[in-house]
């Protein structure tokens, strides 16, 4: 199996489209109630779909990997994006920064290098 995409709820699809396009994601599907994006690097996609009310915070965080995290955050801040957490080194060996989209979905921009899939505590292959 391979993960195809993640779909996020959007209170205002047009606002979400502007938000994600402004971050550099490429919109590949457009409709009144739904939009789908491809990540600028790699093959991953995600989408937003219209909802009438914001779901309760579920604890879900969407992670987007950035090769040059600090520069990416600086560029987004210069463009008006507000981060709840500036880039910082975490104990799990990732560098992370967090923000929310217009519907309150939590996003984490991060850089992990080899630790993304191969942290020191990785389980041995079966």
Spans of model-derived segments:
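Vicinal oxygen chelate
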Residues: 2-11, 51-126
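N-terminal beta-strand motif that seeds the catalytic metal site of vicinal oxygen chelate
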Residues: 1-14, 60-62, 112-126
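Short strand-connecting beta-turns/loops that link adjacent beta-strands
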Residues: 13, 30, 41-42, 92, ...
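Conserved acetyl-CoA-binding loop of GNAT-fold acetyltransferases
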Residues: 21-28, 81-82
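Conserved short beta-strand elements that form part of the metal-binding/catalytic scaffold
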Residues: 26-60, 106-113
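Alpha-helical macromolecular-interaction surfaces
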Residues: 15-18, 71
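Short beta-strand-to-loop elements that line the ligand-binding cleft
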Residues: 8, 28-29, 86-89
């Amino acid at each position: 199996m391979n993960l195809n995409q993640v779909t996020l709820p959007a209170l205002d699809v047009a606002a979400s489209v502007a938000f994600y396009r402004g971050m550099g994601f490429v919109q590949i599907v457009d409709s009144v109630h739904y939009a789908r994006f491809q990540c600028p690097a790699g093959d991953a996609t995600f989408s937003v779909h219209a909802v009438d009310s914001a779901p309760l915070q579920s604890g879900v965080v969407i992670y987007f990997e950035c090769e040059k995290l600090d520069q990416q955050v600086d560029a987004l801040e210069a463009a008006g994006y507000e981060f709840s957490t500036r880039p910082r080194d975490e104990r799990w060996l990732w560098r992370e920064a967090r923000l929310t989209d217009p519907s309150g979905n939590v996003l984490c921009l991060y850089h992990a290098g080899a630790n993304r899939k191969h942290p020191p505590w990785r389980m041995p292959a079966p």
